[in-house]
């Protein structure tokens, strides 16, 4: 039985599912413990699940067997988009510097190195993965040794630090421990993890001693590309509207839940959503349209979790299409269209309800359309944040005709998508279209 710590806006649904799947939920919040009648269990987790920054998904990290077991069950239930990191978080390896700020690790993977470190090209050293590579995003590795346990982490930074989730009164206890029994480790580098707040001093001290011995062994190094210590598996899981609907069903089995609960929670709604849950009623579309009247941003989420945030001003809703206006910064070239962005250029973005695409038409300062870019994506969710997940294939329309873009990128990352989302071209319009202030128009 794997131990899972679950946090965030999906916590009720995922806790319900995790318990059904045979996981033991540890360190629950008071609200979750009360809802499920859980007995206090402050054991360190095998897997931690928390919100992704976009609030349209989660990140899962921990013991690889536990992470894979959780992802397997979640995929079966909610059919989400899943991106797995190519290297493990806190993995320690022998790397060879291939530039002033890059290092080559196991399997030829190249990591960025923070600029505060000075590298000598060609030199080898010991590195730790501090941000794993995922999708096209490079990982980040630091020339430090980090040895992580359940309660503490020993490192070579020379600092003592504490998880942000450790309350002030517990931090005082741990600070005293660092200055007494753990003094020799604190001088090297020591970080107290969130589970340390629940652990007795003896358990923390015993773990620190074992980690120190392991650190000494690791410091002997090895050959370039060698992994000296395995880290934690890491994955990004994104929920489109269909996956969120399944999570709504799971939550509804525990507490009153309106349709669209998780989509509205991703919009940042708090107490008013709790009220809607208890009052009941099918109000999702009306609530989403109301929030869209003050739309402030477009969240264009890549399947590996990267979020492109674009500020937008609402123009209005036109026949089931939300129209937004975005200012463009001069300089650069419009993707897929090849027109240089001049001062005063702007974009009108049309977000049709229930469709698998978003339309961006670009205009000069005088209001002349210069081209349209259509993204294939999951069905967009309306609100103060317009949220959708990029399916990586696009179409561009301009005076030169129509072009399909980025098919090669989609094919490279197709395995991240569930089968139901693996035909992005079918979601795109077959004829040229434009986004105008009156909505989407077909070009004759």
Curated annotation (Swiss-Prot):
Matches recorded under InterPro entries: DUF402, FomD-like_sf, Ntdp-like, RNA-bd_FAU-1
Enzyme category, top tier: hydrolase
Top-level division of the source organism's lineage: Archaea
Keywords recorded for this protein, A-Z: Endonuclease, Hydrolase, Nuclease, RNA-binding, rRNA processing
EC code: 3.1.26.-
GO molecular function terms noted in the UniProt entry: mRNA 3'-UTR AU-rich region binding; RNA endonuclease activity, producing 5'-phosphomonoesters
A Gene Ontology BP annotation from the UniProt entry: rRNA processing
HAMAP family: RNA_binding_AU_1 (MF_01910)
Functional note: Probable RNase involved in rRNA stability through maturation and/or degradation of precursor rRNAs. Binds to RNA in loop regions with AU-rich sequences.
Family as reported in the entry's similarity comment: Belongs to the FAU-1 family.
Record's protein name: Probable ribonuclease FAU-1
Organism listed in the record: Pyrobaculum arsenaticum (strain DSM 13514 / JCM 11321 / PZ6)
